[in-house]
């Protein structure tokens, strides 16, 4: 029977899913293509039809989900936004909710935290670094805009506020992933972010949001 494009894509995705399960369970270095083929119910030759090697397969798995920083970048259109602090707070809380409920993202992100980014895998590290750099620039732009609008507490310098938020947001996510979810990301993260943004807001901003 002739295989359709949909059949081929289903097989390819099945291989990626099998690799994800084994990478998560055993680690990348301790997972062979033979094991992935057995897990996926295909031959090793079938894997080579879709992927050049294990590194290529790993890259396909990583590319199958956006980085959480990339999700933030896609939504954080802060230029001329009437309330940039509310925008950032909402985006951050939504990101925590998504990560806390999406088991597949959790597995892939945790696989990535265990990876030594050497050789061909360095491009994954470069992708993360690029996304983090862009996210930080957006945070700074948002806090600068909030300051210009009189919405940022004058006790905070915009860049200091942006860095503080960045370190809290990224740091708690990385700790949660690295140390195997040792706290409630959504509950603790929500309380921390809301508390920090309460400190960020000027009196005028708080009045505007409660009006």
Predicted segments, located by residue:
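Amphipathic alpha-helical segments used for helix-helix packing
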Residues: 86-87, 100-129
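Short coil/turn segments at alpha/beta junctions that flank glycine-rich nucleotide-binding fingerprints
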Residues: 25-29, 80, 102, 149
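Short hydrophobic/aromatic patch on the recognition helix
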Residues: 41-51
């Amino acid at each position: 029977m002739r295989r359709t494009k949909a059949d081929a894509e289903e097989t390819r995705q099945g291989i990626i899913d099998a690799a994800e399960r084994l990478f998560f369970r055993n680690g990348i270095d301790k997972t062979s293509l033979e094991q992935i083929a057995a897990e996926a119910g295909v031959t090793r030759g079938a894997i080579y039809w879709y992927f050049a090697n294990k590194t290529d397969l790993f890259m396909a798995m990583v590319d199958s989900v956006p980085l959480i920083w990339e999700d933030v970048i896609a939504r954080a259109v802060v230029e001329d936004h009437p309330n940039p602090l509310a925008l950032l707070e909402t985006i951050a809380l939504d990101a925590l909710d998504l990560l806390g409920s999406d088991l597949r993202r959790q597995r892939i992100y945790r696989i990535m935290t265990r990876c030594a980014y050497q050789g061909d895998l360095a491009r994954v590290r470069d992708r993360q670094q690029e996304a983090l750099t862009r996210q930080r620039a957006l945070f700074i732009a948002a806090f600068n805009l909030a300051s210009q609008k009189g919405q940022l507490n004058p006790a905070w310098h915009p860049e200091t506020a942006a860095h503080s938020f960045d370190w809290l947001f990224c740091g708690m996510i990385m700790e949660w992933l690295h140390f195997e979810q040792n706290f409630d990301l959504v509950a603790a993260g929500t309380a921390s972010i809301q508390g920090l943004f309460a400190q960020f807001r000027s009196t005028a901003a708080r009045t505007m949001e409660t009006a």
